[in-house]
Amino acid sequence: RIEDTIQELVNLYGSRAVIVVICGNNAKLKESLENQCKGHPNVIIQGFTKKIPLYMDACDVLFSKPGGLTSTEAAVKGVPLIHTAPIPGCENRNAAFFARRGMSYYCQEPAQQAKYAKLLCENQFLRFRMAEAQRRNTNAGSAEEICGLLRQAVGSDEVTSCMF
């Protein structure tokens, strides 16, 4: 539960860290977390935003369920990543894929998630090693490569750009 992870982080860091939680369109979760985090000015609860890339750039550690899009975006950006509780099925496989390659830590226990965050924040070598594993295992230029393959497949240079 995200509520438990937030509490573990608050217990571990107190006011020494800013914790930003992005709830997307989940208004019920946002309201619940706002109520839980009253009195903790260093915990920011955010609803839907189009500024996810900026938040990722600013964060020291990203907690996320192991969905493909957020996980891949974090890996391409070299953001230290802790995968939390997956939705059964492909997210289990995503978490295992990332963790086996050193691209994330994977843990469903909130206390352990907080400990992993502390390790990543305090140990530059661990952050570097994870970012290096992410770099080795992702291709930031894959969209352009796909466009090139599409150009070859249609036998035309009329495909000038791809928007994703």
Predicted regions and their residues:
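C-terminal "capping" alpha-helix adjacent to the active site of nucleotide-linked donor transferases
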Residues: A99-L126
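Short alpha-helical segment that forms part of, or immediately flanks, the ligand-binding pocket
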Residues: P53, S71-K77, A96
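C-terminal amphipathic helix plus adjacent low-complexity
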Residues: Q124-F164
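Acidic donor-binding loop of glycosyltransferase active sites
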Residues: D57-P66
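Donor-nucleotide binding loops and adjacent catalytic segments primarily
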Residues: R1-A58
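A short alpha->beta transition loop at the rim of the catalytic pocket in nucleotide-sugar-dependent
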Residues: C59-D60, G78-P80
